């Protein structure tokens, strides 16, 4: 999530930033997997907990401050099928980041959404709607409300012990805050190399591009580049621990929005 978190309090010279980019993180990538056919809809709870060190808590170009933060992320989902190839998902998701020292970096998101996915010859085509609430602080002050309309295409390629999972996503954000309205393009590649039934090497290189369309941010263009490497251990089929190192950089035609960030930490993923 932190991949594109924006400093929500900053609605000054250039308005609000891009908002939690890594909504398309490894968890979301897995969430794009095909829904098995069920005769009746099924409920699930999916989430993660991640204590993390960052060397740039406030996404600053010039005033870098290191800190530790805690990030829980929980979703409740209802999955079902309309046909053998057409599945749907209704979900509610809450996540936040709480810093040990740099409290200005605290932020939270709550959202509800729906996704419709067509499976065609191994490819997954999805249409997604999300009603999103971004908060300054840990659910302290509502910063803005958004309606995200998304389309994605994804597929898994398996070769022996290697799984490659490319995903492309296009989003337009409607928002009550003019500076938050924008187009967004995501391209990522999930990589998993199984060493044995329990251990894997994982990585999710990511590229994101933002084109802001309104308010003081009109004309602003950002690009985020992210690379990571991690080791994953599966306790069971639905509980795993991944420890990873992530490097991220943002380029922008607004110089003050450029930054670099290094993050290190474990993440516990679960699904029930």
Regions found by a protein language model. Give the residues of each.
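Transmembrane beta-strands of outer-membrane beta-barrel proteins
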Residues: 43-49, 88-92, 110, 123-127, ...
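Outer-membrane beta-barrel channels and translocator barrels
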Residues: 40, 81-85, 117-123, 154-160, ...
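Residues that define the transmembrane beta-barrel architecture of outer-membrane proteins
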Residues: 41, 66-72, 104-110, 143-149, ...
């Amino acid at each position: 999530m932190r991949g594109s978190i924006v400093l929500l309090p900053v609605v000054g010279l250039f308005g609000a930033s891009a908002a939690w980019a890594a909504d398309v993180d490894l968890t979301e990538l897995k969430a794009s997997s095909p829904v098995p056919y069920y005769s009746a809809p099924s409920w699930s709870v999916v989430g993660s907990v991640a204590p993390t060190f960052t060397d740039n808590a406030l996404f600053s170009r010039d005033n870098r401050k290191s800190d530790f933060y805690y990030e829980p992320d929980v979703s409740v989902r209802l999955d079902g099928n309309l046909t053998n190839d057409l599945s749907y998902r209704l979900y509610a998701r809450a996540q936040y980041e709480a810093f040990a020292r740099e409290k200005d970096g605290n932020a939270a998101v709550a959202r509800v959404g729906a996704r419709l996915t067509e499976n065609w010859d191994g490819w997954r085509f999805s249409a997604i709607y999300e009603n999103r609430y971004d908060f300054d602080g840990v659910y302290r002050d509502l910063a803005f409300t958004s309606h995200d309309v998304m389309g994605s295409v994804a597929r898994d390629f398996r070769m022996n012990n290697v799984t490659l999972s490319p995903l492309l996503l296009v989003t337009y954000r409607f928002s009550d805050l003019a500076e938050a309205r924008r187009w967004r393009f995501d391209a990522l590649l999930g990589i998993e190399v199984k060493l044995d039934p329990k251990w894997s090497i994982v990585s999710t290189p990511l590229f994101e591009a933002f084109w802001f369309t309104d308010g003081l941010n009109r004309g602003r263009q950002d690009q985020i580049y992210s690379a990571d490497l991690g080791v994953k251990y599966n306790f069971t089929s639905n509980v795993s621990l991944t420890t990873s190192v992530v490097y991220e950089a943002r380029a922008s035609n607004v110089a003050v929005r450029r930054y670099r960030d290094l993050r290190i930490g474990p993440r516990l993923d679960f699904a029930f």
